[in-house]
Amino acid sequence: VTEPDAGLDTGRLKTFAKKINNGYLVNGQKIWTSTAKIADKILLLARTIPIEECKKNTDGLTLFYTNLDREKIEVREISKMGRAAVDSNQIFIDNLEVPEFDRIGEEGKGFKYILDSLNPERILIAAEALGIGKNALSRAVKYANDRVVFNRPIGKNQSIQHPLAENW
């Protein structure tokens, strides 16, 4: 969903799917696309109606589930410090032909459809972040108890105890 110039403002997406004979011709780019390095398919939200012709900026977006054609989609991995189990990528779409059959639901209603998955995904990501934070805190406590300086664990010092206790 995310694009470099739109961020979380889904209504500002610029990737465009132009209607052609039996489908659509898609051009644009996305960022933070998970598993694009290994995926065979892509879930793609693209504008099919120019934003100027829409009542709301979230109108005119259409959802597709189609083949990730590497002849038409360039995938560049984004380096990350964490969450390395899943690759994150920037993708560049150049004249990708998408059959009409690969459209999900009605044309122009894609934002409504994508919301059904975005809200649960946000909860999942929040739960993941809480788990990562809890694990980091547990490791910090273990380190404070294991690290010995001047013959005593650094966890005996109030300057170490207070931030750990505040975050427990």
Positions of PLM-derived features:
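Glycine-rich phosphate/pyrophosphate-binding beta-alpha loops
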Residues: 4-6, 31-37, 83, 120-124
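A short core secondary-structure module
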Residues: 27-76
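Histidine/acidic-residue-rich, glycine-tolerant segments that coordinate divalent metal ions
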Residues: 7-11
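Glycine-rich beta->alpha junctions and the first turn(s) of the following alpha-helix
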Residues: 73-168
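A generic structural signal for beta-strand entry/edge sites
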Residues: 21-25, 41, 88
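A structural signal for short hydrophobic beta-strand segments in well-ordered beta-sheet cores
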Residues: 15-18
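General beta-strand structural signal in soluble alpha/beta enzymes
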Residues: 1, 25-27, 66, 105
